[in-house]
């Protein structure tokens, strides 16, 4: 996914472009043996999913040595009431935005706008001057 942030500084339009990738990895199977409310043995096997969102600033003039910022989360999809794939992806994205903010890549205002983006499109265009977010499918 591609995110473009357009910002106007002293009448000059500046833009930043980010490439965002989402990756899912599974942990080793988790085995749990417990007793239910009637005293019967219950044997359960499930896997947790690690969701990783990586983001780097796209600059065609800079072909090497890009800093990649990542956000990860581990979701226990065994408990489907509390975790979903979409929620795990959103938490990992927020962690990635926090890393971009803490490293000074984006401003507070840009980070607040990036928090609103859901990673379900091909591209987003964020215009900070007019405060508009445009989804491009």
Label for each model-derived stretch:
Residues 2-4, 18, 44, 67, ...:
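Generic short N-terminal amphipathic or hydrophobic helices
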Residues 90-103, 107:
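Short, compact, well-ordered microdomains
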Residues 2-5, 14-33, 108:
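C-terminal binding/interaction regions
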Residues 102-137:
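Intrinsically disordered, low-complexity charged/polar segments
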């Amino acid at each position: 996914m591609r995110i473009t942030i357009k910002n106007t500084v002293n009448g000059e339009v500046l833009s930043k472009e980010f490439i965002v990738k989402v990756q899912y990895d599974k942990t080793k199977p988790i085995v749990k043996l417990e007793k239910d409310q009637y005293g019967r043995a219950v044997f359960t096997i499930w896997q947790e999913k690690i969701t990783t969102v990586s983001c780097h600033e796209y600059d065609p003039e800079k072909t090497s040595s890009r800093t990649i910022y990542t956000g990860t989360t581990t979701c226990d999809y065994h408990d489907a009431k509390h975790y979903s794939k979409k929620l795990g992806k959103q938490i990992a994205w927020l962690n990635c935005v926090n890393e971009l903010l803490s490293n000074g890549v984006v401003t507070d205002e840009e980070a607040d706008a990036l928090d609103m983006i859901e990673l379900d499109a091909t591209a987003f265009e964020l215009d900070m001057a007019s405060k508009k977010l445009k989804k491009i499918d």
